Amino acid sequence: MSDPLVLIPARLAATRLPNKPLADIAGEAMIVHVWRRAVEAGIGPVVVATDTAEIARTVEAAGGLAVMTRADHPSGSDRLAEALEIVDPEGRHDVVVNVQGDLPTIDPAIIGAAIVPLADRTVDIVTLCAPITDPHEADNPNVVKLVGHAVGPGRLRALYFTRARAPWGDGPLWHHIGLYAYRRTALSRFVALPPGELEVREKLEQLRALEAGMRIDAAIVDDLPLGVDTPADLERARALLQGRRLN
């Protein structure tokens, strides 16, 4: 692992919260807050990948770098792969970190945590998880659960991802956080694969990698970043970031 690249896919076509990346939070667009958190992680260059000129202009006005991608990508991973080839056609970056564009309050430290397990050459992809502490989350299908076993301090090997409560019995349940660090070769392989049977059934793209025999490990973090999906989430993010600004 030599020189990671951080990519933030962003597009306007959100159903529950229209124009989400451009929503104002404490005087700046949400996508700018995400870009700033990724820069603060200090692991490598940060680029926003978008199919919307207004998003690109907003990021660039804040001092960031954005690239335009096609509008017809079936998934964020495909957008990621196109952006990687635009930004780094020479292949200098051998790791790409995918930070979702709706995490304006994310702790930069957990972005950095995602690349650590890639020191193990048998790992293809790394993601994050946090312990489920709210019993209502265990049965909530909107909370994706990671099923895995420990392979070291603060690290799990993912065996499955599901919207159901799993695994059964006593023990921790893990809330999956949709941030990924890919080896470049793994990302290329992943986007070339057809959708998997379990991926389609659970509506979870990461299952495609497991079905194909790729290894996904997860770094355990203490806190869940706030994902902004609804107007209520947006108000929570505004309160949090306005409070930080006042402090």
Curated annotation (Swiss-Prot):
GO terms for cellular component: cytosol. GO terms for biological process: CMP-keto-3-deoxy-D-manno-octulosonic acid biosynthetic process; lipopolysaccharide biosynthetic process. It is found in: Cytoplasm. Keywords: Cytoplasm, Lipopolysaccharide biosynthesis, Nucleotidyltransferase, Transferase. The keyword ATP-binding does not apply. It catalyses: 3-deoxy-alpha-D-manno-oct-2-ulosonate + CTP = CMP-3-deoxy-beta-D-manno-octulosonate + diphosphate. Pathway: Nucleotide-sugar biosynthesis; CMP-3-deoxy-D-manno-octulosonate biosynthesis; CMP-3-deoxy-D-manno-octulosonate from 3-deoxy-D-manno-octulosonate and CTP: step 1/1; Bacterial outer membrane biogenesis; lipopolysaccharide biosynthesis. Activates KDO (a required 8-carbon sugar) for incorporation into bacterial lipopolysaccharide in Gram-negative bacteria. This is 3-deoxy-manno-octulosonate cytidylyltransferase. It comes from Methylobacterium radiotolerans (strain ATCC 27329 / DSM 1819 / JCM 2831 / NBRC 15690 / NCIMB 10815 / 0-1).
